Amino acid sequence: ISKIFSTGMSLGGFMSYRLACELNEINSVGSVTGSMSGYYQCNPPKKTSTIHFHGTADGVVPYDGVEWSLSARDAHAFWKTHNVCNSQTEINLPDFNGDGRITKRLISYDCEEEKSVELYSLEGEGHIWWNRSWGHDINTSELIWQFFKNQ
């Protein structure tokens, strides 16, 4: 096995981040509506690429964070700092379904060991797994797989 990836939704996303915080074998993490614990001090043993998807109206794991969970942007900032990423850009993705909601893609790149850190912020969206065939603007599964393949 040359590369190990971990992905999960909600608590599975928390688990994936925790694995990257503790295990040297994890190459990349994908988190959907999960974040990092506000109670746990993460000290990753190596650089790790991350991709994170979060709805801004998530009522289960709030986008802006709570005592027990970092905000989506704080989780992104943690991995950007850990991976020593020198550049960042944010773009709005096309509104394929025409609902007027914006998906923002925040990309941190030019990181050490060719790692990258991405955050998809889905305006007005809740605690779900996104799929274009269900009428959403993005397909989470495809984006995670493409991200992992490039790591």
Task: Give, region by region, the residue ranges found by the protein language model.
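Conserved alpha/beta-hydrolase "acid-adjacent" motif
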Residues: 59-71
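A conserved short beta-strand
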Residues: 25-35, 49
